[in-house]
């Protein structure tokens, strides 16, 4: 049983509150906390003209703002500080605020602490969003009122008084959000772990440690779901504090979900055949298995089967865009890691024309090159990592008999033109960057929408 939200309302009233970062989750938080009687100041590196939201109404309500290049200079003597998820917990300004007596927290920490409904929380390096959405859809099909949030959906803390005890809440959580989570989570899922976000985390060890926070504070009756086939997640079994279920594409399991002889099972009961699954790619079969284990105590097999047969995917995840002169174009902009792009390549029955590259998260492309080269007909690279990816593939070509045409370009428009010029009847072109988008775009959605807009106008 989580804490009563009335406790938070009493706690926050008349407190001097700093909210760092005025993005999607924190902007509604500013108004919400102000309405609860907090004395709020919003901090953001952007100036007022660059903010996506108009702040004049909030100013009229007494909210203060510190904006622009030196926005953190006046963050001093606050009672409570809400950090933005991308801000490290050991940032000097947070250490200073804590030494002054401030309570450091985040929107997600407070939501998990006070959420009245059963929580299903999902983390991992790949497959988080699709699996989160699958869990949401299965629970909804079962007849529950379901809320979805975290990295997808809407900020939920401001809706907390609308959420009922019998509802279900599904959260996609990043390693950044998990770094400071110290609350028990009823159902925790780790889809898989591979190198990622090493531009933010000090090393792989810190990244894994953050992921483990999803189950570190679980109680005896809480449930942890892990991937039996992933070396890192399998090792987490030793640290499980509650009950454990697994999912596997390789092994038959007495408890949990598995894939065997082209059928998907949960607790040794068949859900459906792989031919009935609407989602493209075996990595999505794995995502379904993860979802089945998570909802096995709250859902019927009928609801699992219905979603498996009818769910056709999430925007920007191997999303079919258009067929032009017998060449099919797919948008996989969500693929911000090499493992995700490799999974996308393996989903097609022929080598594809791949558009890749983007923001450098300081991770290796060696495995993508070694295992992906045979799945690529033509590699088109752009963004900060274009030469880094090119070198990884050239090394594979030097060490083997493989050969692959590689084109380097400076914009997504140029990349699409090269793809169009080289595409032949029956070919597949996919944007699956293997990198984050921040070098050229605001986020992966903007990158994907730009790609789709250009393709639809060809």
Curated annotation (Swiss-Prot):
Gene Ontology molecular function, alphabetical: ATP binding; UDP-N-acetylmuramoylalanine-D-glutamate ligase activity
Presence of the UniProt keyword Isomerase in the record: no
Predominant localisation class: cytoplasm
GO cellular-component term (any): cytoplasm
InterPro entries in the record: Mur-like_cat_sf, Mur_ligase_C, Mur_ligase_C_dom_sf, Mur_ligase_cen, MurD
Pfam family, one: Mur_ligase_C
Gene Ontology BP term (one): peptidoglycan biosynthetic process
Entry keywords, A to Z: ATP-binding, Cell cycle, Cell division, Cell shape, Cell wall biogenesis/degradation, Cytoplasm, Ligase, Nucleotide-binding, Peptidoglycan synthesis
Listed Gene3D superfamilies: Mur ligase, C-terminal domain, Mur-like, catalytic domain, NAD(P)-binding Rossmann-like Domain
Subcellular location: Cytoplasm
E.C. designation(s): 6.3.2.9
Pathway(s) per entry: Cell wall biogenesis; peptidoglycan biosynthesis
Reaction catalysis annotation: UDP-N-acetyl-alpha-D-muramoyl-L-alanine + D-glutamate + ATP = UDP-N-acetyl-alpha-D-muramoyl-L-alanyl-D-glutamate + ADP + phosphate + H(+)
SUPFAM superfamilies to which the protein is assigned, alphabetical: MurCD N-terminal domain (SSF51984), MurD-like peptide ligases, catalytic domain (SSF53623), MurD-like peptide ligases, peptide-binding domain (SSF53244)
Binding site for ATP: 124-130
Family to which the UniProt record says this protein belongs: Belongs to the MurCDEF family.
Role according to the record: Cell wall formation. Catalyzes the addition of glutamate to the nucleotide precursor UDP-N-acetylmuramoyl-L-alanine (UMA).
Name of the protein: UDP-N-acetylmuramoylalanine--D-glutamate ligase
Organism annotation: Clostridium tetani (strain Massachusetts / E88)
Species classification: Bacteria, Bacillati, Bacillota, Clostridia, Eubacteriales
């Amino acid at each position: 049983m989580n804490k009563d939200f009335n406790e938070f309302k009493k706690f926050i009233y008349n407190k001097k509150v700093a909210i760092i970062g005025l993005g999607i989750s924190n902007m509604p938080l500013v108004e919400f906390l102000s309405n609860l009687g907090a004395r709020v100041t919003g901090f953001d590196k952007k100036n007022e003209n660059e903010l996506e939201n108009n702040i004049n109404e909030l100013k009229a309500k007494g909210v203060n703002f510190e904006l622009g290049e030196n926005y953190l200079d006046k963050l001093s003597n606050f009672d409570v500080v809400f950090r933005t998820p991308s801000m490290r917990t050991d940032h000097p300004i947070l250490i200073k605020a804590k030494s002054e007596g401030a309570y450091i927290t985040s929107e997600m920490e407070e939501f998990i602490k006070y959420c009245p409904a059963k929580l299903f929380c999902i983390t991992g390096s790949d497959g988080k969003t699709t699996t989160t959405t699958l869990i949401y859809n299965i629970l909804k099909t079962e007849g529950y009122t379901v809320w979805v949030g975290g990295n997808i959906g809407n900020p939920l803390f401001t809706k907390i008084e609308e959420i009922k005890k019998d509802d279900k809440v599904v959260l996609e959580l990043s390693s950044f959000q998990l770094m400071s989570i110290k609350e028990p989570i009823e159902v925790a899922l780790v889809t898989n772990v591979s190198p990622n976000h090493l531009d933010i985390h000090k090393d792989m060890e810190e990244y894994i440690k953050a992921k483990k926070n999803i189950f570190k504070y679980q109680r005896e009756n809480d449930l942890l779901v892990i991937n039996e086939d992933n070396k890192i997640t399998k090792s987490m079994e030793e640290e499980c504090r509650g009950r454990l279920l697994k999912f596997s594409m390789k092994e038959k399991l007495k408890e949990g979900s598995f894939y065997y002889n082209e059928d998907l099972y949960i607790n040794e009961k068949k859900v459906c055949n792989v031919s009935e699954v609407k989602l493209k790619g075996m990595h999505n079969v794995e995502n379904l298995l993860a979802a089945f284990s998570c909802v096995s105590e709250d859902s019927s097999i009928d609801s699992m089967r219905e979603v498996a047969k009818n769910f056709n995917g999430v925007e920007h995840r191997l999303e079919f865009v258009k067929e032009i002169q017998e060449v099919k174009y797919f948008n996989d902009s969500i693929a911000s890691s090499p493992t995700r792009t490799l999974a996308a390549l393996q989903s097609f029955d022929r080598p594809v024309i791949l558009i890749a590259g983007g923001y450098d998260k300081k991770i290796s492309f060696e495995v993508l090159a070694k295992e992906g080269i045979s799945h690529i007909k033509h590699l088109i690279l752009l963004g900060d990592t274009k030469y880094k990816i090119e070198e990884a593939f050239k090394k594979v070509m030097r060490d083997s008999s493989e050969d692959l045409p590689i084109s380097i370009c400076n914009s997504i428009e140029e990349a699409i033109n090269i793809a169009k010029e080289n595409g032949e009847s029956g070919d597949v072109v996919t944007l699956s960057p293997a990198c984050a988008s921040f070098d050229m775009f605001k986020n992966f959605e903007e990158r994907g929408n730009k790609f789709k807009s250009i393709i639809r106008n060809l």
